[in-house]
Regions:
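Short gly/pro/ser/thr-enriched loop/turn and capping motifs at secondary-structure boundaries
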Residues: 76-80
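Conserved non-catalytic scaffold segment of RNase H-like nuclease domains
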Residues: 1-70, 84, 91-110, 116
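Acidic, divalent-metal-coordinating active-site segment for phosphoryl/phosphodiester hydrolysis
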Residues: 117-128
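Acidic active-site catalytic centers that drive phospho-/nucleotidyl reactions
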Residues: 53, 74, 121
């Protein structure tokens, strides 16, 4: 857990279920980013709408020496490609209407209980 050093806004509590006491014992953002950078090194990153996560990380990393250059796979784009190139073309409009992580979990019959919960989102994304 990361302690942002600022008050956790109500939206963070509602959407991500993060309470102030959840982050109080967390590590500082700089330490978390250093650990993350070391962990991902040259690995392929996978995410749902992964460009959003990458943009946030690039902004937080700040200087050019640490910019992320990892290859990335976006599960939303993979799903879109499958729809456009697979046997489901007749359902394309309906299937493309909602490509949220929860919607894709439903389409692919994956258990998904709690959106915007980091571990749950990561687990479902990995299964996609």
């Amino acid at each position: 857990m990361v302690n942002p050093g600022v008050h956790v806004p109500a939206a963070g509590v509602l959407v991500h279920k993060l309470r102030p006491n959840d982050v109080e014992q967390g590590i500082p953002p700089a330490e978390a980013l250093a650990e993350l950078r070391q962990f991902i090194e040259d690995k392929v990153l996978v995410g749902h709408f992964v460009h959003i996560d990458l943009n946030v990380l690039r902004k937080e990393l700040g200087d050019e020496r640490h910019q992320l250059s990892n290859p990335a796979i976006d599960t939303a784009r993979v799903h879109r490609w499958l729809l456009q190139n697979g046997p489901w073309k007749e359902d394309l409009e309906q299937q493309m209407a909602n490509i949220s992580l929860a919607a894709l979990a439903g389409i692919y019959n994956l258990d998904f209980h709690e959106a915007h919960h980091a571990l749950e989102d990561a687990f479902v994304t990995a299964r996609l």
